[in-house]
Regions:
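Nucleotide-activated donor-binding/catalytic signature segment of Leloir-type glycosyltransferases, i.e.
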Residues: 5-37, 44
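A charged, aromatic-enriched C-terminal amphipathic alpha-helix characteristic of glycosyltransferases
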Residues: 108-138
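Conserved acidic donor-binding segment of nucleotide-sugar-dependent glycosyltransferases
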Residues: 87-94, 102-107
Length: 148
């Protein structure tokens, strides 16, 4: 896909990633103060992580901005999102490439997945919801401690 530009945004890119700058249409930014200007220009977010721990905020940020995400199982495991939530879980490089090309070529599907992604974040990853759960848990601990 010659018209596609790939932006690799994030701190501490490896030497192997930095060398990708030599490829036409590949931009490696390194650390940026705010990822949103890059996301607002994107059609799809990709997360080809082989190792990931916990929730990947970068994925939730992309989903919140109505971007479909193609990611590895490792990258998406902490989000608990499924294919009905605007993500494509790619088990192999072949599937990763296929899903990415499909989304790049199909505007309607891309839009639908982006809307699903945003809805998922709104329903499952809002601070108010998590703060309420944390507050309830802390109250339970205080009561349990007081009665112990």
């Amino acid at each position: 896909m010659p018209a596609v530009q790939l932006y690799i945004v994030g701190r501490n890119p490896t030497q192997q990633v930095r060398q990708l700058r030599r490829q036409p249409n590949v931009i490696v930014t390194g650390a940026v103060p705010d990822v949103r200007p890059y996301l607002v220009q994107a059609w799809v977010a990709v997360a080809p992580l082989r190792i990931a721990r916990g929730v990947q905020n970068k994925i939730l940020e992309a989903m919140a901005m109505e971007l479909p995400v193609v990611g590895t199982p490792a990258a998406l495991q902490g989000t608990w999102a499924t294919t009905t939530d605007g993500v494509r879980i790619a088990e192999s490089p072949h599937v990763f490439a296929r899903d990415l090309v499909t989304l790049l070529e199909d505007h309607a599907l891309r839009r639908q997945c982006g809307l699903q992604a945003r809805r998922y974040v709104q329903e499952h990853h809002q601070w108010d919801e998590h703060n309420a759960r944390l507050e309830a848990l802390l109250r339970e601990l205080v009561v349990a401690q007081a009665t112990a």
